[in-house]
Amino acid sequence: MSKHITGHTGLLCLLGSPVAHSVSPEMHNEACDQLGLDYTYLAFDVPEDKMPEAVQGLRTMGARGWNITMPGKNIMCKLADKVSPASEISGACNTIVNDNGVLTAYTTDGVGFMRAVAENGVDIIGKKMTLLGAGGAATAILVQAALDGVAEINVFNVRDNFFGRAEEIVAKLNKRTECKVTLHDFSDPEVLRDSIAESAILVNGTSVGMAPNVDRTIITDTSMFHKDLFVFDVIYNPQETRLLREAKEAGCKTGNGMYMLLYQGAASFKLWTGEEMPVEIIKEKYFS
């Protein structure tokens, strides 16, 4: 990959901490090269308390836009001039578009999830979903799924720091969408079993099973799986978690978070450039 930077080259970037591990620079720079777009994408390690200064600098310099990873997704919404419906409901964003100094916040994680599910040949519109977790990734999935037309979503989470915030988001979704959303305490396995039995899709939106803890799974009773269930895990390291392996053994179709990552990036890319990311090329080079 080569990049010839001139005085006209536009700036795209990633803000967060840490960011050195991110595949976003390779992915977006490759897409710009393939399409002949004069942008460069860089990663900047910015802690949460420095986000306001970083945003002011990027606004002043005329950066076209940026992605935000942890820990800046919540504060970035407050720094934006406008917010998308999904970002307003969740209170978080992962993408900023700068239009002549006016910053608009978007959330593309949920968009990436919905596209990844569709690419697996699974239709969940008008269906029921069981969602495990209420952190950042799970919330983005919850909000976008409700906005896009999933009929019913049961969210299961332990009573941790995310539970109160999840209650507020669930209330907003029940008021503003036609989706029926219910928040449950994870401690009741029979309620979980009943929900999964009625669901077209089960989503693990937690980090349980992520490397190096690959022997862990959030569903310890595999009799909850059924052959008509699509099981999706937001984790992509490992690509097949214990949850997905055991679901597949039970006859379920499965998918991981790798293409969710790709498609959220593609959604951000289109917001900045107006162009479709060449996802097949990006898949082959960075996601195979």
Name these PLM-found stretches.
Residues 3-120:
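Phosphate/diphosphate ligand-binding glycine-rich loop within oxidoreductases
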Residues 16, 105-107, 126-147, 157:
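Glycine-rich adenosine-cofactor-binding loop
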Residues 179-254:
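Rossmann-like adenosine-cofactor binding region
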